[in-house]
């Protein structure tokens, strides 16, 4: 019974708990529902409030935008009205100007018409005068024929001859004036081109000697060079062809000879013998052969260097070798290779200024004295020898060939490059310090120059100036006429060319001055 009672209690307790749970759930549901309804209502109210505020704000924005749009429309309309007023005013001004121009044109047209009428009247008057003149001329001719007994054709021929003489005189004066003007312009342009070439090209130059000095380690070496009974020095001079001068100069000997190549070979031979220390005839010949090969290599290398520096291509190897030989040639103390390089550069600059081919000018300038490399071995002038050598070694450019053969006037040429080479050659040779000559021969040449000038009849005074490059001659005006001075200048030039040896050219300037003096009392 006790167990049943406990079971019932448990059941009742469980039932009460379930009932309480159901009641609590229901009450919680009702509470949550009420809370949810209250929240929803509050959210709806808030949403309504936000919507109302948004409507109010949108209305305010709408009013503000409308106001701004109205203001912009008003401003645009005002701007448009202002532009329209300005355009209208501008059109009115333009219209007024057009009206003024039309009025001016009308006035000018009226003036032109008036002048045209006056001109027509003048033309009529002139025609009338011409008719009267023709009538008078006809009457005059008839009267002249009656008085002179000449026909009209005969009188016409006399007048034409007179007019022809006057016209010839005027034409001669005009031609002389134009020739003088052209000559002055040409001289001016030539001076400008030559001055520019000289300014753009500058080179160092040292005059060459005809002797070479070899330094010795001590004076005892002189005895070894001479050898027993002079056999070493004799062998040396025989093999090299150069004089070996041994004097009192301490620790030095002198090599003398007119051929610079042989002198250079002899110098190298002697230096090698001194360095080796063994000096006897067989050794001299051996060292001579070595020195000769070295100089030949130096000649070839020198030619190749010069050709490369000047940018000249397609030269025959023998011509390159001859160019290198020019390093050991001199003319009035001036190194011929240095002179040829200088001529090539100056001619190239002048050719560029004249719009000519610079490479042809440089090529002709470098080769113009190529004949001097062999002119002591071959008969003839160096210009013609050089011309033959260039042709032999496949130089085909006719301008280059003519410049080589004709740069001293020994053959007739038509090439402008020949004139360029002559000018560049004269510039290189004539500049101060380029060439030299002994004082004695220089003074004798100046004296001879003045003697030639003074030997002509009518010469009052003659002065050699510009270091003998110009002779200025004053003649007696009562003995020599203007026509005679031209002939005299030409005769003096011929005498100078036939009797004097000189570098460059000599200008012969014959001056005839006439003075008339009167006194006013």
Swiss-Prot record:
Domain spans labelled HD: 336-430
Family annotation (InterPro entries): HD/PDEase_dom, HD_domain, HDIG_dom, KH_dom, KH_dom_type_1, KH_dom_type_1_sf, Ribonuclease_Y, RNase_Y_N
Alphabetized GO MF terms: RNA binding; RNA endonuclease activity
Membrane association type: Single-pass membrane protein
Protein origin, superkingdom: Bacteria
Cross-referenced CDD domains: HDc, KH-I_RNaseY
Record keywords, A-Z: Cell membrane, Endonuclease, Hydrolase, Membrane, Nuclease, RNA-binding, Transmembrane, Transmembrane helix
Membrane-traversing stretches: 10-30
GO cellular-component term (any): plasma membrane
Domain KH: 210-270
Main location: membrane
EC number: 3.1.-.-
Intracellular or extracellular location(s): Cell membrane
One GO process term, biological-process aspect: mRNA catabolic process
Disulfide bonds: none
Free-text function comment from the UniProt entry: Endoribonuclease that initiates mRNA decay.
Family: Belongs to the RNase Y family.
Protein name (record): Ribonuclease Y
Organism of provenance: Caldicellulosiruptor saccharolyticus (strain ATCC 43494 / DSM 8903 / Tp8T 6331)
């Amino acid at each position: 019974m006790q167990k049943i009672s406990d079971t019932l209690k448990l059941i009742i307790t469980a039932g009460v708990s379930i009932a309480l749970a159901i009641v609590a759930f229901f009450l919680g549901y009702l509470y949550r529902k009420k809370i949810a309804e209250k929240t929803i209502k509050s959210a709806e109210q808030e949403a309504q409030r936000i919507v109302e505020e948004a409507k109010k704000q949108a209305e305010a924005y709408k009013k503000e935008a409308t106001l701004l749009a109205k203001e912009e429309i008003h401003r645009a309309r005002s701007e448009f009205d202002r532009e329209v007023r300005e355009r209208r005013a501008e059109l009115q001004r333009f219209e007024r100007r057009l009206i003024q121009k039309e009025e001016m044109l009308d006035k000018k047209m009226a003036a032109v018409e008036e002048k045209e009428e006056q001109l027509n009247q003048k033309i009529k008057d002139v025609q009338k005068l011409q008719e009267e003149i023709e009538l008078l001329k006809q009457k005059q001719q008839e009267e002249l024929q009656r008085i002179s007994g000449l026909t009209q054709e005969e009188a016409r021929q006399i007048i034409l001859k007179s007019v022809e003489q006057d016209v010839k005189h005027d034409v001669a004066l005009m031609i002389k004036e134009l020739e003088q003007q052209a000559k002055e312009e040409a001289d001016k342009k030539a001076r400008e081109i030559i001055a520019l070439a000289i300014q753009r090209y500058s080179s160092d130059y040292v005059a060459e000697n005809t002797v070479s000095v070899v330094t010795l380690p001590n004076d005892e070496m002189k005895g070894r060079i001479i050898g027993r009974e002079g056999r070493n020095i004799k062998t040396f001079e025989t093999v090299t062809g150069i004089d070996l001068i041994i004097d009192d100069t301490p620790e030095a000997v002198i090599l003398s000879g007119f051929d610079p190549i042989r002198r250079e070979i002899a110098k190298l031979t002697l230096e090698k013998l001194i360095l080796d220390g063994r000096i006897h005839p067989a050794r001299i010949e051996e060292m001579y052969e070595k020195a000769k090969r070295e100089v030949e290599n130096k000649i070839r290398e020198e030619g190749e260097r010069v050709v490369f520096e000047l940018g000249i291509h397609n030269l025959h190897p023998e011509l390159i070798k001859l160019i290198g030989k020019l390093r050991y040639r001199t003319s009035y103390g001036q190194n011929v290779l240095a002179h040829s390089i200088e001529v090539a550069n100056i001619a190239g600059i002048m050719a560029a200024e004249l719009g000519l081919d610079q490479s042809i000018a440089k090529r002709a300038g470098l080769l113009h004295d190529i004949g001097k490399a062999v002119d002591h071995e071959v008969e003839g002038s160096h210009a013609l020898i050089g011309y033959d050598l260039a042709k032999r070694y496949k130089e085909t450019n006719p301008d280059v060939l003519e410049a080589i053969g004709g740069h001293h006037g020994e053959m007739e040429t038509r090439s402008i490059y020949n004139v360029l080479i002559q000018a560049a050659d004269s510039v290189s040779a004539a500049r101060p310090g380029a060439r030299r000559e002994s004082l004695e021969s220089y003074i004798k040449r100046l004296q001879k120059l003045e003697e030639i000038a003074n030997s002509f009849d009518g010469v009052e005074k003659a002065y050699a100036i510009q270091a003998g490059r110009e002779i200025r001659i004053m003649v007696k005006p009562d003995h020599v006429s203007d026509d005679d001075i031209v002939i005299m200048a030409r005769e003096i030039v011929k005498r100078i060319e036939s009797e004097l040896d000189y570098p460059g050219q000599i200008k012969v300037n014959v001056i005839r001055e006439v003075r008339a003096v009167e006194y006013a009392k």
